[in-house]
Amino acid sequence: MKLGVVGLPNVGKSTLFNAITNAGAQAENYPFCTIEPNTGVVMVPDQRLNVLAEMYHPKKVTPTTIEFVDIAGLVKGASRGEGLGNKFLSHIREVDAIVHVVRCFEDENIIHVDGTVDPGRDIETINLELIFSDMETVQRRKDKAEKNFRGGDKKAGAEAELAGKIYAHLESGKPARTYDADDEEKEIMNGWFLLTTKPVIYAANIAEDDIGKDESEIPFLKTVRSIAEGERAEMITISAAIEEDIAQMSPEEKAEFLEEMGIGQSGLDRLITACYRLLGLISFLTVGEDECRAWTIQNGTKAPQAAGKIHTDFEKGFIRAEVVPYETLVEQGSMAACREKGLIRSEGKDYVMKDGDVTLFRFNV
């Protein structure tokens, strides 16, 4: 899964990306310092792997990962190619979801591109550029569908009609993801690859002094929360500067720091968890002396397709999946104990995987 980190210049986007990946993306106090997208892979925090590693003492522990892309900043007019707009829009097309960093702090030493801090205006600036780009796409689709319909393609009529509805929806300033499409319409829209259908998490970048405060005590957050709820997006609060510091700490130092701050989980861990939830992802686990590993799948994935994540042969020759819930395995202490008590289930090709399933796939090729 690939997530694009976006935001106006000087909102803390590259600072946050540095913290996410430790990739050292240049974070300077001027616009467009991130010209080509920096890509980094971050481990998905999963305490279950640590527990399993204590049980199995494997040669290797492999968490699942999410790929983050730091996408160049943009200005008004990006959809017309101004600033770094064309590159911004092409890079957005390649990601599965968008992490939109929004500045929610005052700092006279960090110049805002528009002179003042206004989260609502900043969100609108980026969202409108994405909407304008989608309007062009939808208009082209509508013109093509109408032409095909006149040429005798009856199915094209439905696409042209839908394109008209979506264009009007976008024109009213709403992202395509807030349009209540039925299954047939969703199938048509999937072929359009619209930017505003992508899931969004708003990362409200707050001042270090605001960490630990109630959301109601930070005036900027009310605006961001309202926008997120209105367009079916998620919002988390984060201090990019603090997260960058935490990223340099050892696990022990990090735990001590979070405890001192009165925070149960780092902002990055909350961001990654929110991304998982937003994209409808879960993890299943495999264990053994060689490796304990987490694997990412879409919620609703059936056993053969999950097996295919490990190796295509596992899916082709799938026989069955031997499954025990993580909690049961830990409670019993070993797979042998689970087997002895009849706690390992044998599941066929129609079994829908659950988060935390510890699984052994049987296959024959």
Residue ranges of predicted features:
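Conserved G1/Walker A P-loop phosphate-binding module
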Residues: 1-111, 145
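C-terminal-of-GTPase-core extension/linker across diverse P-loop GTPases
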Residues: 2-6, 17, 139, 144-352, ...
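Short, intrinsically disordered, mixed-charge
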Residues: 22, 54, 90, 128, ...
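Conserved Switch II/interswitch segment of TRAFAC-class P-loop GTPases
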Residues: 40-45, 72-82, 93-156, 169-182, ...
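Amphipathic alpha-helical transducer elements in NTP-driven molecular machines
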Residues: 32, 46-49, 62-68, 82-96, ...
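Short, flexible surface segments
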Residues: 94, 354-355
